[in-house]
């Protein structure tokens, strides 16, 4: 480790005279030690291979939510998935303008440079970003209202799903909207020319998935029916109640 540090470039910056040095979180240091002693030791040859580059076959677009880690859910090895995470696992439509596009940049790199064969949009239950959109009493968290602007991308999904039903429970509406937003993100993916071309040639496949945090159930979007079905096993009774296309 010291040898690597000796070869690393020295980067200097001004912290500001009044900013005290913050200690690195001990939890992360402990986790890193555990990683070195266990996973890195077991997969050292894999990491040595990855030093020369990555060749993932799957891009996964997920939520920033700390409860939903794609690498853990899918038991992925290093280098298997190219993961992009944002609030509410949203994909904006293709928009070639001069503004900054983090998710679109990740998509471009995955499709054009890495040549991934699959793109998965992974949503999850009780998503805070979806709840914020559904709750019209929410106030901006800052003057910039970055989240508020970002989650306007959910609008078309809400319109397509018919909005909240008159007698629909709020939590059920949020879950239904979570499913509908996955479908909307898939539709937005198909507005990107590179995705259109490669999917049309059969070299790229798009998938929608939904993870229930409390139960660990994974649901997959069935393109034929437009409904979400269990990846393994039987459909839970609660999920059967939640449809993404019909208000209660």
Functional labels for PLM-detected ranges:
Residues 54-71:
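Conserved H-X4-D acyltransferase segment
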Residues 8-12, 16-56, 89-117, 128-248:
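Divalent-metal-activated hydrolytic enzyme cores
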Residues 66-90:
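Catalytic core of membrane glycerolipid acyltransferases/transacylases, capturing the structured
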Residues 61-63, 85, 122-124, 207-212:
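Short beta-strand segments
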Residues 3:
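Cationic, low-complexity basic patches in intrinsically disordered or flexible, solvent-exposed regions
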């Amino acid at each position: 480790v010291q040898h690597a540090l000796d070869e690393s470039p020295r980067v200097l910056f001004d912290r500001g005279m009044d900013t005290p040095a913050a200690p690195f979180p001990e939890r992360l240091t402990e986790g890193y030690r555990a990683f070195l002693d266990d996973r890195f030791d077991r997969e050292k040859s894999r990491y040595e291979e990855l030093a020369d580059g990555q060749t993932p076959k799957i891009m996964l677009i997920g939520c920033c939510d700390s409860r939903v880690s794609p690498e853990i859910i899918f038991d992925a090895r290093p280098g298997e998935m190219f993961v992009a995470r944002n609030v509410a696992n949203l994909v904006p439509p293709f928009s070639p303008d001069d503004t900054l596009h983090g998710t679109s940049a990740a998509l471009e790199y995955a499709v054009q440079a890495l040549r991934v064969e699959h793109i998965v949009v992974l949503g999850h239950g009780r998503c805070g970003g979806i709840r914020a959109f559904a709750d019209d009493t929410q106030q901006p968290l800052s003057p910039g209202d970055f989240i508020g602007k970002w989650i306007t991308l959910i609008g078309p999904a809400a319109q397509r799903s018919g909005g909240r039903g008159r007698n629909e429970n709020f939590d059920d509406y949020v879950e239904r909207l979570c499913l509908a937003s996955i479908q909307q993100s898939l539709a937005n993916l198909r507005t990107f020319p590179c995705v259109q071309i490669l999917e049309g040639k059969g070299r790229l496949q798009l998938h929608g998935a939904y993870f229930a945090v409390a139960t660990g159930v994974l649901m997959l979007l069935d393109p034929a029916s437009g409904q979400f079905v269990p990846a393994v096993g039987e459909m839970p009774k609660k999920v059967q109640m939640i449809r993404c296309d019909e208000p209660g």
